[in-house]
């Protein structure tokens, strides 16, 4: 868990040493999708989206691949999953799946090498602000955990058999820092709110669908894209 999806994307790039390269991201997304690569001295190669799904257009991704392309940030737009399977047919590099707007989408977070989620105030499961990184890569996970808290690896159990001063059980004041890290963990208050919001996910989604239906009814005289 991290303090935002933005921090999550940044940490993934730093943990994997992705820098000084080209990173593909879509034209339609929140600005941080394009900004995070710049923080890592990368070029944001912004490619077109499919006019119906509003997700990455695989053909335009293919046209924009370069020898120096080291990552693709594939955004699941408004609950619609990005075409990662299609992109995998011609690209075998790192794909970060941006699940900020797909907390309730079946299969979300399972296609990319790593997924980043958002619990910011306007998302499906808000906790004020916050985010999460998910991956099946154990090596990457082991790097990310201490990176969220200044590279400190000894804070997870502060009460030890030897407190380091008296030789007796007690609170340990020493820190072990094995790597460069950042202060971007999720605080307990955010986590507690998230756990409660999970219980309300169905209700929140039902309300969002009600709002969507109302918009569609009121704007029915305008040109519509096919419903998802």
Question: Residue locations for each model-derived region?
Answer:
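Conserved N-terminal alpha-helix of the aminotransferase class I/II PLP-enzyme fold
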Residues: 1-7, 11, 164-166
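Buried hydrophobic packing segments
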Residues: 8-16, 131, 194
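PLP-dependent aminotransferase-like
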Residues: 14-99, 103
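Structured catalytic cores of enzymes that bind and process phosphorylated ligands/cofactors
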Residues: 38, 47, 75-78, 102-104, ...
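PLP-dependent aminotransferase class I/II
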Residues: 59, 71-75, 80, 84, ...
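Basic phosphate/pyrophosphate-binding loop/patch that engages nucleotide-derived ligands
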Residues: 65, 88-94, 127, 132-153
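Conserved active-site segment immediately N-terminal to the catalytic lysine
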Residues: 94-127, 132, 142, 172-177
């Amino acid at each position: 868990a991290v303090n935002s999806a933005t921090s999550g994307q940044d940490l993934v790039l730093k943990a994997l040493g992705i820098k000084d390269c080209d990173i593909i991201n879509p034209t339609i997304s929140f600005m941080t999708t394009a900004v995070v690569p710049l923080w890592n001295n990368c070029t944001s190669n912004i490619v077109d989206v499919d006019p119906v799904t509003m997700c990455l257009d695989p053909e335009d991704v293919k046209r924009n691949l370069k020898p120096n392309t080291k990552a693709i940030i594939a955004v699941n737009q408004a609950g619609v999953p990005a075409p990662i399977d299609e992109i995998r047919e011609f690209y075998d590099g790192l794909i970060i799946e941006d699940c900020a707007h797909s907390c309730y989408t079946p299969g979300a977070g399972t296609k990319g090498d790593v997924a980043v989620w958002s619990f910011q105030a306007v998302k499906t499961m808000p906790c004020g602000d916050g985010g999460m990184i998910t991956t099946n890569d154990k090596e990457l996970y082991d790097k990310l955990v201490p990176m969220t808290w200044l590279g400190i690896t000894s804070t997870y159990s502060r009460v030890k058999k030897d407190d380091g001063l008296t030789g007796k059980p007690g609170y340990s004041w020493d820190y072990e820092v094995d790597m460069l890290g950042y202060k971007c963990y999720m605080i307990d208050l955010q986590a507690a709110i998230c756990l409660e919001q999970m219980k309300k996910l169905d209700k929140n989604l039902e309300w969002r669908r009600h709002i969507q239906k109302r918009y569609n009814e009121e704007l029915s005289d305008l040109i519509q894209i096919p419903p998802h």
